[in-house]
Amino acid sequence: GPRSLVLLENLNLRDTHSLFFRSLADRGFELTFRTADDAGLSLIKYGEFLYDNLIIFSPSIEDFGGNINVETITAFIDGGGSVLVAASSDIGDPLRELGSECGIEFDEERTAVIDHHNYDISDPGQHTLIVADAENLLKAPTIVGKKALNPILFRGVGMVADPDNPLVLDILTGSSTSYSFFPDKPITQYPHAVGKNTLLIAGLQARNNARVVFSGSLDFFSDAFFSSAVQKAAPGSKRYSQTGNYELAVALSRWVFKEEGVLRVGAVSHHRVGELAPPNAYTVTDLVEYSIVIEKLSDGKWIPFDGDDIQLEFVRIDPFVRTFLKRNGGKYSVQFKLPDVYGVFQFKVDYNRLGYTHLYSSTQVSVRPLQHTQYERFIPSAYPYYAGAFSMMVGLFMFSIVFLHMKEKEKSD
């Protein structure tokens, strides 16, 4: 199974967060538990990654042990590794640095997300035990799961996404009444995060399809929050016997560790309609058929992907043709007429959808002009020129006859 390194604040977390770790182990993950300051830690050995996934459940760590640091974790992400990070109000510098590398800014140490309208009935008084509604989740079933969830319990630090980073995903936002500040101090300055800008859980899919999820709450993954009842403190609020934390945590782990939302390109073929093999070069205005097999990873097996919005572009610097691919059994195909332009073109499928890995396929082909023998003998648009040429010939012939056979009358003296 996928090799996963779990860095813990202390080994007690194995017991307090056992349901989450058991769900991973049941899905075949090989979990290696270490404390985050263990002197023997290593992610990379001889240029090879020792693990496929990294789970960091050690919010307050000030220095990782062994040869792990923010640079090696960033290199791990650059190499396609998956990382799940859980923080808390007691957050150390390494996690803050890792967040800023990924376009996410954590609030200061000792701050918490506060919501005076959406806190749980069991909150001790600081209104930091927040009930997050499922409506605030990102609308992406591949990331947050397909079923409707009960409200989610959250207690931890707030985050803000870098507005210039288009890769950051706002997976769970605070409500419009939430903000992030020190829970035990009066507010003297504008909070770091206010309203919907407050991120409780954020994600990132890098351009190399590496995935990272940041949760501002370590308690979010705890057995206590998984099995707790939840009810907002507002009068008349509905009581739920269980939170939606477990279902959301499992869905997030399936996505971040690439069990969900992974696409790949299978066989690609192209040829003239009526033929089976691709030619050395196409001719302008040929009728062409293109087909591509796209597969999705599901429970460890590759199955045909079902999408109705996959487009094919026929590109020579700019697209000359852009058309939807139609599903035909296990593959997508389309027939279209090549443009009346010759050059070097590409069949390009560039499919980028929320929650799925970036799918890209390009096949280069040549399109040549018609050979001289392929043109029609007479072109309708040239009829005026033909008429002009033939009328000139006929006119010259008639003029010649008249000129040659006309005698001038002799002048009489």
From Swiss-Prot:
Source organism, top-level taxon: Eukaryota
Keyword annotations from UniProtKB, A to Z: Endoplasmic reticulum, Membrane, Transmembrane, Transmembrane helix
InterPro entries reported for this sequence: DDOST_48_kDa_subunit (IPR005013), OST48_MD (IPR055459), OST48_N (IPR055457)
Classification via Pfam families: OST48_MD, OST48_N
Pathway annotation: Protein modification; protein glycosylation
Transmembrane segments: 384-404
Cytoplasmic side: 405-413
One Gene Ontology cellular component annotation held by this UniProt entry: oligosaccharyltransferase complex
Principal place of residence: endoplasmic reticulum
UniProt subunit comment: Component of the oligosaccharyltransferase (OST) complex.
Function according to Swiss-Prot or TrEMBL: Subunit of the oligosaccharyl transferase (OST) complex that catalyzes the initial transfer of a defined glycan (Glc(3)Man(9)GlcNAc(2) in eukaryotes) from the lipid carrier dolichol-pyrophosphate to an asparagine residue within an Asn-X-Ser/Thr consensus motif in nascent polypeptide chains, the first step in protein N-glycosylation. N-glycosylation occurs cotranslationally and the complex associates with the Sec61 complex at the channel-forming translocon complex that mediates protein translocation across the endoplasmic reticulum (ER). All subunits are required for a maximal enzyme activity.
PANTHER family in UniProt: DOLICHYL-DIPHOSPHOOLIGOSACCHARIDE--PROTEIN GLYCOSYLTRANSFERASE 48 KDA SUBUNIT
Family recorded in the similarity comment: Belongs to the DDOST 48 kDa subunit family.
Protein name per its UniProtKB record: Dolichyl-diphosphooligosaccharide--protein glycosyltransferase 48 kDa subunit
Annotated organism of origin: Gallus gallus
Gene designation per UniProt: DDOST
